[in-house]
Amino acid sequence: MNNDINSSVESLNSACNMQSDTDTAPLLEDGQHASNQGAASSSRGQPQASPRQKMQRSQPVHILRRLQEEDQQLRTASLPAIPNPFPELTGAAPGSPPSVAPSSLPPPPSQPPAKHCGRCEKWIPGENTRGNGKRKIWRWQFPPGFQLSKLTRPGLWTKTTARFSKKQPKNQCPTDTVNPVARMPTSQMEKLRLRKDVKVFSEDGTSKVVEILTDMTARDLCQLLVYKSHCVDDNSWTLVEHHPQLGLERCLEDHEIVVQVESTMPSESKFLFRKNYAKYEFFKNPVNFFPDQMVNWCQQSNGGQAQLLQNFLNTSSCPEIQGFLQVKEVGRKSWKKLYVCLRRSGLYYSTKGTSKEPRHLQLLADLEESSIFYLIAGKKQYNAPNEHGMCIKPNKAKTEMKELRLLCAEDEQIRTCWMTAFRLLKYGMLLYQNYRIPQRKGLPPPFNAPMRSVSENSLVAMDFSGQIGRVIDNPAEAQSAALEEGHAWRKRSTRMNILSSQSPLHPSTLNAVIHRTQHWFHGRISREESHRIIKQQGLVDGLFLLRDSQSNPKAFVLTLCHHQKIKNFQILPCEDDGQTFFTLDDGNTKFSDLIQLVDFYQLNKGVLPCKLKHHCIRVAL
């Protein structure tokens, strides 16, 4: 019995040893087993051990090679015959896919052949690997510009890669993770880097997110917003940098880069889209801006308007701006009246009266790395003497209160002069170029002007008010006649619409509410709110808006700016022959609705100090 058991154990051990020697044989690079003859001969030379000495632990069976062979056979049988693009490299290897005769292949593309660069170590998770978890695979090196099409791409490599990526997507090595952005062409990647989303708010609180280029200027962004909002581009739209916590705001210059300005703004700050008619008013009327006592050059010589403008833009002969300002002391709530001098090098204050000697001047703020802002509510937030405050703020995101230089002028005209002087001394000729760009665009080209047709050249203005028609030679009279004809056409069309419609509104009722569709009518706002809107959109002559009267429910108020001062005129209703009219001069001139009143005073001065030129507008983005 014991002999039978020993004989069966010996036969089992011999079979296990033969199987382990076969499975654990090392693989060569070509996938063949190493020769075991040396091991067999050495084992024959040694004396055989007893059955108990031959008893060994069971060795793990490496199934990687077997799985590779099965997978290779399965894929070869399941896939159609794919032409091998490199028969000279893989044709002699065992287990290679079936090759196709060269005559059956399509003509090769005109590209240089690929080169084989040998083995490389690649991380493939989730596989039975040896040692450090790396597996030796073959890699092909293609020349620059070579692309793998569906015809030349090896099908087995594509399927294997897809199987690995679907099997273990979470444990994939970071070195093998492919970023989809990295596969994009260089031009598309540059476009992604050069674009940024910017959020812009309007006066009514609405906002719009606009994708812009990183080098887009404030002028270009304003033109883009005008196009998207369907507004009239009259070169008066601006982008406003608004800081609600600090109570500061300023209009960006047309040449400033929007992304660069946004990088210096804190998170709570924002951009506003607003009109500013006074942005380049200085270049139109420079003498009206600076009184003689404020400009040092005016005290030394008697120059005209052109000479004053030239001296402001000239870097060598730039005048000094001087005068008294209220300056907030650093670290205190008190304000102190100081004699201040603004030069191209910076803003200085005198420690001894009005002396401008170098030993008496102290630097208050630098112009290069700073910007000047309007104080929105300086009297409430900073205890300023009045509401004509300014602030010089460094151009950085995190600004402490001790770095702000708070100033306050006596009135609005003095504040406008200081703000304009700061911009002129900082930007100089660049500011004048921004002013000239829209004017150059508006001029017709010298040689490419479109030719008018014969029928257009033969048209003339005619007056048919009398019994005999006459030709209007005066251009001003022709324009006035065209406006009158437009008003008459509007009245006729309104009357026809009322007669043809089933609306129960009486014509007088329609005339009483038709003005609410106009941009210059702002509804029920207070006097302070109307003044604030006028100041925000520029204190220029002729800037106006209409609103409901707070004292008389049936009346309206015309708010008008003249000589940088805001005035209010009441529009009262009056009745004549049972019909309601509106008048601004106690019934001397009557209008059936407010639209006719505004149209009339845009052409005629009348009892107003100036004509109506610009209206305040709020646009919803």
Swiss-Prot record:
GO BP: ERK1 and ERK2 cascade; gene expression; insulin-like growth factor receptor signaling pathway; negative regulation of D-glucose import; negative regulation of glycogen biosynthetic process; negative regulation of insulin receptor signaling pathway; negative regulation of Wnt signaling pathway; positive regulation of cold-induced thermogenesis
Subcellular location: Cytoplasm
Record field: compositional bias (Pro residues): 95-112
Pfam families on file: BPS, PH, RA_2, SH2
Processing after translation: Phosphorylated on serine residues upon EGF, FGF and PDGF stimulation.
Domain SH2: 520-601
Job of this protein: Adapter protein which modulates coupling of a number of cell surface receptor kinases with specific signaling pathways. Binds to, and suppress signals from, activated receptors tyrosine kinases, including the insulin (INSR) and insulin-like growth factor (IGF1R) receptors. The inhibitory effect can be achieved by 2 mechanisms: interference with the signaling pathway and increased receptor degradation. Delays and reduces AKT1 phosphorylation in response to insulin stimulation.
Entry's family note: Belongs to the GRB7/10/14 family.
The protein's assembly and partners: Interacts with ligand-activated tyrosine kinase receptors, including FGFR1, INSR, IGF1R, MET and PDGFRB in a phosphotyrosine-dependent manner through the SH2 domain. Poorly binds to the EGFR. Directly interacts with MAP3K14/NIK and is recruited to the EGFR-ERBB2 complex. Interacts with GIGYF1/PERQ1 and GIGYF2/TNRC15. When unphosphorylated, interacts with AKT1 and when phosphorylated with YWHAE/14-3-3 epsilon. Interacts with NEDD4. Interacts with LRP6, thus interfering with the binding of AXIN1 to LRP6. Binds to activated NRAS.
Protein name: Growth factor receptor-bound protein 10
Lineage, highest ranks first: Eukaryota, Metazoa, Chordata, Craniata, Vertebrata
Gene (name only): Grb10
